[in-house]
Every structure is written in C-alpha cells, then in structure tokens.
A protein has these predicted regions:
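Glycine-rich, charged/polar anion/phosphate-binding loops
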Residues: 2-6, 76-79, 101
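A short secondary-structure junction signal
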Residues: 29-33, 75, 103
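Glycine/small-residue-rich phosphate/adenosyl-binding loop
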Residues: 1-45
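Aromatic/hydrophobic pocket-lining residues that form π-stacking "cages" and hydrophobic walls in ligand
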Residues: 51-52
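Short hydrophobic alpha-helices that are characteristic scaffold elements of the AMP-binding
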Residues: 57-58
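C-terminal helix-cap and adjacent tail motif
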Residues: 89-121
Length: 121
C-alpha cells in the first residue's frame, strides 16, 4: 500500500501515462445476466495492457498497471477529448526506474496461489 500511496501523490511527476480505454457498446459482455458484477465486460483489454507492460520492461522502463485515474474520469475524459461512450479502464505510468534498474521479481509460491479441485485456505 505504501508504494501505491506514493504513486498516487506523485502521479503528476510521471513522464508518461498510457491510458487504455474501452467502449462497452462495442464489446460482448457475456455475463451481464448473472446476479453479480460483470467481470467479463472490459476484461479483454487487459491482455493488451500486459503486453504493453512487458514491452516497457524489455526496454528498461518501469511501469505499473493502475486504475487510480478512474476516480477522476470526467476530468480525464475532458483532457483526452474522449467521446461520451468511451471510458478509461487502465492507466500505466511509465518512466525510468528510480534506482536505475529492475530488481528481482518476488512472488508467493505456486502452492499458495493455485488451488486444484477445491478451495484452499
């Protein structure tokens, strides 16, 4: 959370923010009839965002997927001249890593992240 809060308060210092947008009117939302929030609508944009993140890292750039600007969407839409039927769904601040490079990637082990045949607490 500390890193996210830092980013939120320093977002104006980032040299580039890539803004990914979608139009729900031209997307196929296949789970809208379920009794829960849609997770399919707009989800197809995230593979493109992931490719963008990987390409940035390959070029030595630092970046992170955020949705911080969704809270300011009316202002962002005005700044970017987005049509009324288009919305932002991902915001990727891009710049050179502060410490001059990427550190090692650390993740939880697969056994903590994947369940097979049943839910694991």
């Amino acid at each position: 959370m500390e890193a996210g809060n830092y980013l939120a308060t320093h977002l104006h210092e980032v040299p580039l923010i890539a803004v990914f947008c979608y139009n729900p009117g031209i997307m196929t939302i296949t789970d809208s009839d379920l009794d829960r929030p849609s997770v399919v609508g707009g989800g197809s944009v995230y593979p493109a965002v992931q490719n963008f993140l990987l390409a940035c890292r390959n070029e030595g750039l630092g970046c992170v997927l955020t949705t911080l600007l969704c809270y300011e969407e009316p202002e962002i839409k005005k700044i970017l001249c987005l049509p009324d039927d288009w919305y932002t769904c991902a915001h990727v601040p891009v710049g050179y890593p502060v410490k001059g490079g990427h550190g090692s990637i650390s993740r939880n082990g697969l056994e903590k992240m994947v369940a097979y045949n049943s839910w694991i607490d």
